């Protein structure tokens, strides 16, 4: 596979120092994105967990344990550029957001389970996203060496991510609880603004490096497809092993295969200066997991219709 264009070892010279204003803006965009996610969370989402704890745990296992471990093992086995491996690890460390709720609902899975899992995962991600990303990067010789080359300390990344996620999440949860009407009114505009701002920044970076993209897109898409399929498979295997009902299996499978690529892109922009290889992996994930998730949902709906007929 040809990764020359996106391998950070062969990337054209870049400015060594980030522009502080740009970094501040990107940090604020990421914080706004996390804040808007927190505005969606409701107390009822967490109360439902007490009614189906086994199903919630079943859905969390592939997200926070199996997919990160499988991703780390895959990066050790594959000879990929360190920045590509780092992107795979980061995506695996970012649990899915509200999009998985829609796909689960459309596929006639257990929507209540999906919503509750997303709520719990959003809080767990405050600690486990930086933790999982940190240990995977440190336990892979190639990515650990790459971090040293670009002068990034894994502990600094952990602390920075925890703060960037925890503070806006706490503020969003507080506003959602104390001022629910205001939270509902500003949630969509803030979410749309932060996502569009992030995508605009990423798009400008991709356009500037478009001459490097052609050779790398297909092999990187293949990596994303296989990575996503692994998440879906791990979700299915976990739910089957724990004897879940069919609607629960669908919810767990979707939660296992849909990751928060938007959060991953935000972290890449802020922490890794929008590294091209990492951006491509996370961007392709953002597209492909919708394709695979909706394909499954459509298949399930058609199968249910056939059984009903």
Go through the PLM ranges and name each one.
Residues 2-309:
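Alpha-helical transmembrane segments of multi-pass small-molecule/ion transporters
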